[in-house]
């Protein structure tokens, strides 16, 4: 009888451990699914997200090919040499290495994964600078108070002026594509 009790106790412990393990695994799976759903809802509820960034990348690849240009994406920590500066790294922060300006008005860019910060939210950078020898382009995709704006620079910054002069792109197709992505159209 003592031996039978020991076996039953061991079986009970084994069953209990298995049940606890299964319950814990189920709770963990439910928690993970809840977190993933929350992240998806949160990302989809933002003005800019990874899905939109991916769609912009696909568009820029096609758009560049149509113009015999090769555009690559850049972000903080992975900049492109645009003439004498590194974009976007040299343009970001309260005291950037070189000040971005629209016309003669300096602006301050903030890198943003969601586009929900204030000011000029830089959500994407594309340039053909790594593959172009002559005329280089850098496109800054920004959200200004929720409005999609695409700025371009084709000029080498002058050494005597610490500015990278930007202007809104005149390419209607590019502006519309970015606006449609931002507005989920």
Locate each region found by the language model.
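Mature extracytoplasmic domains of secretory-pathway proteins
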Residues: 58, 64-137
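Aromatic-enriched hydrophobic runs in primary sequence
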Residues: 32-34, 38-44, 53, 67-68, ...
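N-terminal, intrinsically disordered, polar/charged segments of Gram-positive cell-envelope systems
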Residues: 1-66
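Extracytoplasmic electrostatic interaction patches
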Residues: 105-185
């Amino acid at each position: 009888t003592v031996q039978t009790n020991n076996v039953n106790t061991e079986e009970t412990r084994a069953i209990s451990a298995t049940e606890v393990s299964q319950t814990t695994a189920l709770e963990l799976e439910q928690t993970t699914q809840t977190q993933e759903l929350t992240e998806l809802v949160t990302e989809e509820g933002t003005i800019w997200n990874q899905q939109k960034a991916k769609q912009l990348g696909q568009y820029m690849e096609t758009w560049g090919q149509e113009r015999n240009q090769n555009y690559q994406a850049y972000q903080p920590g992975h900049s492109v040499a645009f003439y004498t500066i590194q974009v976007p790294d040299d343009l970001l922060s309260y005291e950037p290495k070189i000040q971005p300006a629209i016309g003669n008005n300096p602006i301050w860019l903030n890198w943003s994964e969601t586009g929900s910060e204030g000011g000029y939210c830089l959500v994407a950078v594309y340039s053909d600078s790594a593959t172009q020898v002559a005329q280089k382009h850098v496109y800054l995709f920004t959200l200004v108070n929720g409005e999609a704006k695409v700025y371009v620079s084709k000029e080498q910054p002058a050494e005597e002026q610490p500015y990278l002069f930007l202007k809104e792109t005149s390419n209607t197709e590019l502006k519309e594509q970015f606006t449609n992505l931002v507005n989920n159209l």
